[in-house]
């Protein structure tokens, strides 16, 4: 008897424990259903605490995990009495030890463990930067081969707090290619013998890893928050928070009302925001993504750009927003930079661009009256502590093994 099954959200078909991304009948998301219906915390230092609701057999022993703390300075500035910060990054003084400084590492640990338990040998993924860094780090720790395809804009984000190992294979793309081009090339590489696609939002282990931010908050606060703030590019983090909330509601000890998802995109590239404002389930490229590549290049937080986000799919972001009566925002670079300066000066830790975008949306929400001053609010600071990390670690840049000019390059040229 396994710990969980995977269930299709459209047709209901069930699959036993395995590394599976899709249903054989349709394109809906799969969702894990666990034997453990109550969250029983394990004695592990990081994400492994939440083993009850992670789709792996062995408990994860990494010290990397989310932390939640009650804000004082920022809360006072905004007139909020119950503002909590979910922090994923490096801040040892607060017990935060994610050495890649991003909550993407919460995805990488369970995914690589599930791959190992399923007999997989090598994983292929596309990244705008942060995800690639996280998977490279876990590859360096475990020795599992990882093939990472990254657009040129993501290369500076591909550093590690240890020397890169031979198990890390970085493929860069020339300027003019974006994250979606990287996804397309990675998809082709993943079809080669011996390769397994990481799967993006379809990867249940990835979503469950990100969902631990919500689990940690509920355990820390004693209940689910009323509101959840996060910046989104693909929307996977928002979906993950929603799915974690559904489990917490079923547990029965953390409240019955789902947190309202308050999610943000970074102008000028905001396809999900555009579709949601018009009440549409579908993204219409000619309306929502005009001049997409140009707009992506102009975006402050480039990791928040995906031309094919899991918005419309059954179990995707549209469903999450509908179920939680959610709100979406669009934030400019200037608003994000102002929020970054405010957050860092008040809370005392540096944050990455996506977190600055999320912080800006909280300022907008307060101004618009979308939160009550006594509401319980969770602000997901999904990446931070980079400057703090550099005080303790020497960082190493990962060098590309090959650079390609387009996603349709003949695969034999890659010499994989």
From Swiss-Prot:
It catalyses: O-phospho-L-serine + sulfite + H(+) = L-cysteate + phosphate. This is Cysteate synthase. Is inhibited by AP3 (DL-2-amino-3-phosphonopropionate) and, to a lesser extent, by L-aspartate or AP4 (DL-2-amino-4-phosphonobutyrate). Is also inhibited by EDTA in vitro. Its EC number is 2.5.1.76. Keywords: Coenzyme M biosynthesis, Pyridoxal phosphate, Transferase. It comes from Methanosarcina acetivorans (strain ATCC 35395 / DSM 2834 / JCM 12185 / C2A). Pathway: Cofactor biosynthesis; coenzyme M biosynthesis. Pyridoxal 5'-phosphate binds at residue 130. Signal peptide: none annotated. The lineage of its organism: Archaea, Methanobacteriati, Methanobacteriota, Stenosarchaea group, Methanomicrobia. Belongs to the threonine synthase family. Cysteate synthase subfamily. NCBIfam families: cysteate_syn. Its cofactor is pyridoxal 5'-phosphate. Homotrimer. The modification N6-(pyridoxal phosphate)lysine is found at residue 104. InterPro entries: Cysteate_synthase (IPR022401), TrpB-like_PALP (IPR001926), TrpB-like_PALP_sf (IPR036052). GO terms for biological process: coenzyme M biosynthetic process; D-serine biosynthetic process. One of its GO terms (molecular function) is threonine racemase activity.
